[in-house]
């Protein structure tokens, strides 16, 4: 029996750190990093123009929902800094969600609005929400980089946010009346991926790759 899978495409800064955290989330089956969102064909690391560094995630929707992936995405990168993550500057490091269908677009818009309304971040959420275009797979040396080089560069970590559930519940009720859905991934402790990989809070460790 063939397993039903879905795909998500996200950009949130250097793809090394993004992949290292997202690949360990329960229900994620496969990830690969690459370049998307721009207009340079056959993009490479040395020539990707205005593409973003991005990650393609294949997941089992019976285990994890697209909404939950987005919630975790908003927890592991700063969506309020235009074209920047940590030490990394430029459009390659922008925050973006590339949806593959209208349902994903609606979920992305709802999730981004809920994060913005919660004031969990000091600034306004600037995450771009755009239709997915061509995804150019990155070179082999960029795939699973931190799995191969555990002490390599990363600016991504799981934020331990203060009482996000309570704050977001208020915003959900305010925005949607009885349509409240728990903001399940943003919890103050016991993040689900920790059970699989012992995820820790890492700061920027090395100069830009």
UniProtKB/Swiss-Prot annotation:
Question: What does UniProt list as catalytic?
Answer: 14
Alphabetized, the UniProt keywords read: Oxidoreductase
Stored InterPro entries: Met_Sox_Rdtase_MsrA_dom, Met_Sox_Rdtase_MsrA_sf
Q: What class of enzyme is it?
A: oxidoreductase
Give the span(s) annotated as Disordered: 183-209
Write out the GO biological process terms. protein modification process
Bias type Polar residues, positions? 199-209
The UniProt record lists the keyword Oxidoreductase: yes
> Do the record's keywords include Oxidoreductase?
yes
Name the catalysed reactions. Answer: L-methionyl-[protein] + [thioredoxin]-disulfide + H2O = L-methionyl-(S)-S-oxide-[protein] + [thioredoxin]-dithiol; [thioredoxin]-disulfide + L-methionine + H2O = L-methionine (S)-S-oxide + [thioredoxin]-dithiol
Gene3D superfamilies reported for this sequence: Peptide methionine sulphoxide reductase MsrA
List the GO molecular function terms: L-methionine:thioredoxin-disulfide S-oxidoreductase activity; peptide-methionine (S)-S-oxide reductase activity
List the SUPFAM superfamilies. Answer: Peptide methionine sulfoxide reductase
E.C. designation(s): 1.8.4.11
The cross-references to Pfam families, in alphabetical order and at most eight, read:
PMSR (PF01625)
What PANTHER family is this protein classified in?
Answer: PEPTIDE METHIONINE SULFOXIDE REDUCTASE, PEPTIDE METHIONINE SULFOXIDE REDUCTASE MSRA 2
By sequence similarity, the record places it as follows: Belongs to the MsrA Met sulfoxide reductase family.
Q: Which NCBIfam families match?
A: msrA
Please explain the role this protein plays, according to its UniProt record.
Has an important function as a repair enzyme for proteins that have been inactivated by oxidation. Catalyzes the reversible oxidation-reduction of methionine sulfoxide in proteins to methionine.
What name goes with this protein?
Answer: Peptide methionine sulfoxide reductase MsrA
Gene assigned in the entry: msrA
